[in-house]
Amino acid sequence: MAPPSYSDLGKQARDIFSKGYNFGLWKLDLKTKTSSGIEFNTAGHSNQESGKVFGSLETKYKVKDYGLTLTEKWNTDNTLFTEVAVQDQLLEGLKLSLEGNFAPQSGNKNGKFKVAYGHENVKADSDVNIDLKGPLINASAVLGYQGWLAGYQTAFDTQQSKLTTNNFALGYTTKDFVLHTAVNDGQEFSGSIFQRTSDKLDVGVQLSWASGTSNTKFAIGAKYQLDDDASVRAKVNNASQVGLGYQQKLRDGVTLTLSTLVDGKNFNAGGHKIGVGLELEA
């Protein structure tokens, strides 16, 4: 099995702090699939403070015999997105994709060509922004050996003829434990730990620090599976922000998520946030 992409390193710990929380939002997600294999994913949310409503529609169709995937997206900002991807055709583990964005109101448009390759001990990704003035080239690679992972991510601006990103990562992963450390541009240092302590309890820890500042961030979170249909989540950071979440499967294809964010430093001042999410799948 190939290692994860650079962007997915430490994902298990990040999911502990991000999934199951919808602070300050009323959120609705709907997923469905036709008999012909076309997937529809509709999402929308309303910001409780600003009242702004945002929605998106995604359609995806796969031609399995040719490893072809066609994806189209539209959102209420009137932005159109299209992607054509081919996987495992020219070479096992190789994925080629071409994507484009277009905003009719502003006339802004851009395209990107992506290449991804995964093998037993290596995962490499690269994309080129299609720009006549000079493309921006992003590339990353992750090497894996006996649970150890080492990754590098870079970006090259052809207009300025210089590297704009230099990120390094090192980690170790097992079935129930994931350690991830990273250095971004030699200035930002971060680390995370994910531990599955039992079949029902997952725990995560995150730490980050930026050189030249005294701004250190620390957070600890957990997810506990009450039963097959219900789970609770909790997280707290060094800013005394406490997040709580509860997720309940009401029936097949219907899941309700409730969450709240409490400011521990200003508990009596109010300003705490709640979130409600409903997921429907048919």
From Swiss-Prot:
The keyword Transit peptide does not apply. Changing residue 273 to R: Significant increase in apoptosis when overexpressed in muscle cells, resulting in severe wing posture abnormalities and impaired climbing ability. One of its GO terms (cellular component) is Nebenkern. It is found in: Mitochondrion outer membrane. Pfam families: Porin_3. Ubiquitinated. Undergoes monoubiquitination and polyubiquitination by park; monoubiquitination at Lys-273 inhibits apoptosis, whereas polyubiquitination at Lys-11, Lys-19, Lys-52 and Lys-109 may promote mitophagy. PROSITE patterns: EUKARYOTIC_PORIN (PS00558). It comes from the Eukaryota. There is a cross-link at residues 11, 19, 52, 109, 273 (Glycyl lysine isopeptide (Lys-Gly) (interchain with G-Cter in ubiquitin)). One of its GO terms (molecular function) is voltage-gated monoatomic anion channel activity. Forms a channel through the mitochondrial outer membrane and also the plasma membrane. The channel at the outer mitochondrial membrane allows diffusion of small hydrophilic molecules; in the plasma membrane it is involved in cell volume regulation and apoptosis. It adopts an open conformation at low or zero membrane potential and a closed conformation at potentials above 30-40 mV. The open state has a weak anion selectivity whereas the closed state is cation-selective. PANTHER family: GH26960P-RELATED, VOLTAGE-DEPENDENT ANION-SELECTIVE CHANNEL. Interacts with hexokinases. Consists mainly of membrane-spanning sided beta-sheets. This is Voltage-dependent anion-selective channel.
